Amino acid sequence: MADRHTLEELNNCSREELITIVLMMQGQLDTLNENIERLIEQVRIANSYRFGKHTETLDSIDGQMSFFDEAESCCDLSVPEPAAEEVLPSRRNHKKKGQRETDLKDFPEEILPPYQVSTEELDTFYGAGNWRRMKDETYKRLRHEPESWTVEIHTVEVYVGTGGDHQDEFLRGKRPKDLLRGSIVTPSLLASILNVKYVNSSALHRVEQEFQRNGVNISRQTMSNWIIRCAEKYFAPFVDRMKQELLSLPVTQSDETPTQVIGDSDRPNSKCYMWVHRSGEFYKERPVVIYEYQKGRDHEKPLEFYRNYKGVLVTDSLAQYHLLDKKLPGVTNANCWAHARRAFADAVKAADKKDPLSVKNSVAYQALQKIAEFYRIDTELKELPATDRLTQRQTRIKPLVEDFFAWVKQQAAECTVPPKSRTGQGLNFVIHQENYLKVFLTDGDIPIDNSASERAIRTFCIGKKNWMFHNTAKGARASALVYSISETAKLNNLRPYYYFRYILTELPKYCDEKGNINPAKLDQLMPWAEELPEECRKPRRS
């Protein structure tokens, strides 16, 4: 801040000194105005995230413009007049007949006693004998019954020798291996707990309360112990086998989200992270999701996970991933276009909607339109084989991408927007990430963005809003293992509860004499295995 001058000092200044003072004040005023505009933009963005729609689609951003300025904002004289076929409504698709029967066909049925009409009532209404019985009407309703509890009583026959070589020796019937020795927990009970906590994102204290309402007293501490012990004994080797499958794929995707673990931090309230690694979005045959708990998100974490990997890793712009390109010769990092457009979307959301034409003419809005065209074309190509998708990308999208980067560099060079504004930050981000953002043009199996990873980690993000934190690192690692199985099961169109129940029934059979499991022997239990029982599979609606 410059010194304040008194009236007497200004009167005594020379012409050159006055010019210097005015120019200096103009510079200060420009800086202040720029800071004020940036602060206003930040407030609008914060309000948008807090109160507005949590979406970055161009249509939703357009929808925030003033209703009374709709004609001006939507006017585009270059748009051709639509044909009659585009204007006239298409014939309405009526609901398919028999759909209810199809939806209900796999459920057990119970025929209830018929609702009868007595002979006396018939004679009174029609007159004696003036009636005959027609075909009965039937209809179906779906009934739900709360979960039931059954105590399993297992009986083991015991014999003792009374003579011969084995006198006084005991012989017992061969009993199945317990899930946890000496515990009342069964595969069905633990599967139910896992389904409620990790699939439906409910906290264990709510499960405990629901159990108590049904007269079952199982504390959340007991449930936590069951989860951790089974995760360490059974799920760890199981997920190791899934990880082997993931790292054999040519394209993977990764993301991370903060979480709080009370007992695993040197500093109170410091952030730990849950990482998610998944198969490429276009890999539909055996999709895999691996969760991994880590204390931080420095580059050593993904470096260790992908140390022996050879392929393309799709991520956001986190610098830690970019280091993998340099330290791991087999890894190529591809960036996410959804992150590239985020700053521009924020800028448009924060713009003054009283002047929609200026918003549409803004650099941020034009950038969004250009990126939206990439997405529009790429969406059309999703069902194509990878080779055809690559050909189409090279022909139709690559020229648009090259034009986009040339346009971005021109805007940055002309300094049309303040560098510290969201638009300025967006331009700077795109320029610095150019090489990473172009990688999807080199392989048809590389997705245009990392949205699949964000979807894979969403269940965890919903869950942590309910249970807030983990108490221990053991609990966090156990959660990572369970989420890996449940999310992979969902991607493979399995029903998580039935799948958990099945593998918890089978996994004890794979333990050797020391209680260890060889991951190489678990192929027939994997979520994509053809040997899985039909009840594990999600019914397909016709």
Spell out what each predicted region is:
Residues 1-181, 223-224, 253-254, 393-396, ...:
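Short, flexible loop/hinge motifs at secondary-structure junctions
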Residues 2-3, 8, 101, 158-542:
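Catalytic center-proximal scaffold of phosphoryl-transfer enzymes
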